[in-house]
Amino acid sequence: MTRETTAAAAESTIRSLEDQRYAAVIAGDVDGFLALAHPDLVYTHSNAEVDTLDSYVDKLRSGHYVYHHIDHPVSRVLIAGHTAVVVGEMHADLTAGGVRKKLANRALAVWVRDRDRWLLLAYQPTVIPGDDR
């Protein structure tokens, strides 16, 4: 395989994993999300709150976060060695702490290759200002 072929295959895999992780949280499939997440996950929210894997999963299990719908267009996937950076957006309809919300964020997700599989290591959304939505 050429370097370009390998990078294209990795990009395709990462795009699929992004679809799977969003589908898991929409479905309330915590085990499905856990299968995709690195144990050292840093999950930052658009309100600047930061969760670890354990605290985020606890919030999913308790119903603190209930995702009703998510669109997540991907602009770019950058592959550098065993790291993939996903640049895109996340538009969501969710309930957080009992309050229904709509989110419009630019988003950055970091995946790392660990023992022949890709795992989500970090997620960072940034609110898109109202005029730019």
Specify the residue positions occupied by each region the protein language model found.
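A beta-strand edge to alpha-helix "cap/lid" segment located at domain peripheries
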Residues: 1-35, 40-133
